[in-house]
């Protein structure tokens, strides 16, 4: 099992391990693909996607025993059985009380795979799961407590599979998963599941990435979003790049325990536009601006928590009130305004208020195109949502334009032969 051509693992100065190109890659070219080492479909997508291959289709067949896993056909059901059998009987016996988190489910599958798989897999051509960083020594008490809760859930729902694992090993594995796990998303960036892609995890982060990771079922694909020359390191982005430098680095330190020194973080050249203020005859004081940024960061976090327990109309009210308050100091293209508009759009989509969703989306798309890199999935998915909203409201001319804008980005990011591209082209023919 050879390594993909044109790439090699190396020691990246100041960053530890990394991946570099040994030949040049053109814009949109596939560098490599990586099948998932293990993966799990998210609970909310059960019945919409096959648990084994993640295909989205209607009329999937249920597992005869637990009635909670869904498959395209017998082949997919058989393919998934080594992993589904970890859960099937527990799902039956626990009923409504079966509630392990996605991280716990994924970790149980890693443990099961490690018991049966002794050779390196096709997902580990550059790096094995065992080599993952855990950053265990850097975890604060809150993060350690969350891991302890996950270990308890693992023992509760997967007792047969973890009876001979000691707590220290489980703590280490959960810390590895937290740093190296991936979320699989669809073309509109809706969450489909979680997975482990060891070779993809080898790539280091930059806020000016030269590759992008997309998914074809349960396979990750890595494509160039800039021209890459021989000898250059291959960088992906670990985080959402909308936010200003300080916020991005707070997120990187909290989740991955490092700060970024890429060109964007060194120059901060996009920050002034991302944090732009209203031109007022009586400009706000520096302290007022700082206070509003603090308020904005707090409301972002408050909303994230509120999603779990508030009603859609209450969530929309949080968005509207915060936009009203921030709008006294920030312009509409300020990233904190955009963040809350995006949340409001999501709530409108959930409530099937298509006109409301469109109102927010139309405000978001132009600044998104300015703040994000050229071939951004965030921009593509926004054009796609807008296009589908316009088409649904029979505004076909403007809908066609929006869908074509999404396609132009996706043909580079996903590759021209991706089934998402074929689906959108079908939508354009209607």
From Swiss-Prot:
**Residue ranges of domain SET in the record:** 5-239
Q: What reactions does this protein catalyze?
A: L-lysyl(4)-[histone H3] + 3 S-adenosyl-L-methionine = N(6),N(6),N(6)-trimethyl-L-lysyl(4)-[histone H3] + 3 S-adenosyl-L-homocysteine + 3 H(+); L-lysyl-[protein] + S-adenosyl-L-methionine = N(6)-methyl-L-lysyl-[protein] + S-adenosyl-L-homocysteine + H(+)
Q: Which biological process, per GO, is one annotated for this protein?
A: negative regulation of cell population proliferation
Q: Any idea of its EC number?
A: 2.1.1.-, 2.1.1.354
**Keywords per UniProt:** Chromatin regulator, Cytoplasm, Metal-binding, Methyltransferase, Nucleus, S-adenosyl-L-methionine, Transcription, Transcription regulation, Transferase, Zinc, Zinc-finger
Residues binding Zn(2+) 1: 50, 53, 72, 76
Q: Where does Zn(2+) 2 bind?
A: 63, 66, 84, 88
Q: Which InterPro entries match?
A: H3K4_H4K5_MeTrfase, SET_dom, SET_dom_sf, SMYD2_SET, TPR-like_helical_dom_sf, Znf_MYND
State whether keyword Zinc-finger applies: yes
User: Gene Ontology cellular component?
Assistant: cytoplasm; cytosol; nucleus
The zinc fingers classed as MYND-type run over 50-88
- What coarse category fits the chief subcellular location reported for this protein? cytoplasm
UniProt keyword Membrane present:
no
Sequence positions that bind S-adenosyl-L-methionine: 15-17, 135, 204-205, 256-258
Location(s) in or outside the cell:
Cytoplasm, Cytosol; Nucleus
Listed Pfam families: SET, zf-MYND
Q: Which superkingdom is the protein from?
A: Eukaryota
User: What GO terms are given for molecular function?
Assistant: histone H3K36 methyltransferase activity; histone H3K4 trimethyltransferase activity; protein-lysine N-methyltransferase activity; RNA polymerase II complex binding; zinc ion binding
User: TM spans, by residue?
Assistant: none
The protein's role, per its UniProt record: Protein-lysine N-methyltransferase that methylates both histones and non-histone proteins, including p53/TP53 and RB1. Specifically trimethylates histone H3 'Lys-4' (H3K4me3) in vivo. The activity requires interaction with HSP90alpha. Shows even higher methyltransferase activity on p53/TP53. Monomethylates 'Lys-370' of p53/TP53, leading to decreased DNA-binding activity and subsequent transcriptional regulation activity of p53/TP53. Monomethylates RB1 at 'Lys-860'.
**Family note:** Belongs to the class V-like SAM-binding methyltransferase superfamily.
Name of the protein this chain belongs to: N-lysine methyltransferase SMYD2-B
Q: Which gene encodes it?
A: smyd2-b
């Amino acid at each position: 099992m050879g390594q993909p051509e044109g790439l090699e693992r190396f020691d990246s100065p100041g960053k530890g391990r990394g991946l570099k190109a040994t030949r040049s890659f053109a814009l949109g070219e596939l560098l490599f693909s990586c099948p998932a080492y293990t993966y799990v479909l998210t609970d909310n997508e059960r019945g919409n996607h096959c648990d084994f291959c993640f295909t989205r289709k209607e009329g999937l067949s249920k597992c005869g025993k637990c009635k909670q896993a869904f498959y395209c056909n017998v082949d997919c059901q058989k393919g998934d059985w080594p992993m589904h059998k970890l859960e099937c009987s527990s799902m039956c016996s626990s009923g409504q009380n079966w509630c392990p988190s996605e991280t716990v489910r994924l970790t149980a599958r890693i443990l099961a795979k490690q018991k049966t798989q002794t050779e390196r897999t096709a997902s580990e051509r550059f790096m094995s799961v065992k080599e993952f960083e855990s950053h265990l020594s850097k975890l604060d008490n809150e993060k350690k407590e969350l891991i302890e809760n996950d270990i308890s859930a693992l023992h509760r729902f997967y007792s047969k599979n973890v009876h001979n694992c000691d707590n220290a090993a489980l703590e280490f594995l959960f810390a590895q998963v937290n740093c190296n796990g991936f979320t699989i998303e669809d073309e509109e960036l809706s969450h489909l599941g979680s997975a482990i892609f060891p070779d993809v995890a080898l790539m280091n982060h930059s806020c000016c990435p030269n590759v992008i990771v997309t998914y074809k079922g349960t396979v990750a694909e890595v494509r160039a979003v800039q021209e890459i020359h021989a000898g250059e390191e291959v960088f992906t982005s670990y985080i959402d790049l909308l936010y200003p430098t300080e916020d991005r680095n707070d997120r990187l330190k909290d989740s991955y325990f490092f700060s970024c020194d890429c060109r964007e973080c060194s120059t901060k050249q996009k920050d002034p536009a991302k944090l732009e203020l209203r031109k007022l005859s009586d400009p706000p004081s520096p302290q007022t601006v700082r206070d509003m940024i603090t308020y904005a960061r707090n409301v972002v976090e408050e909303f994230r928590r509120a999603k779990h327990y508030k009603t859609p109309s209450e969530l929309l009210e949080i968005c509207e009130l915060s936009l009203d308050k921030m709008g006294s100091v920030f312009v509409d293209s300020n990233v904190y305004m955009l963040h809350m508009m995006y949340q409001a759009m999501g709530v409108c989509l959930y409530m099937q208020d298509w006109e409301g969703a469109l109102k927010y989306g139309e405000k978001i798309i132009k600044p998104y195109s300015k703040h994000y890199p050229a071939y951004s999935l965030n921009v593509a998915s926004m054009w796609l949502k807008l296009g589908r909203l316009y088409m649904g409201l029979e505004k076909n001319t403007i809908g066609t334009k929006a869908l074509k804008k999404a396609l132009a980005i996706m043909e580079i990011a996903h590759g021209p032969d991706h089934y998402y591209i074929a689906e959108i082209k079908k939508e354009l023919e209607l």
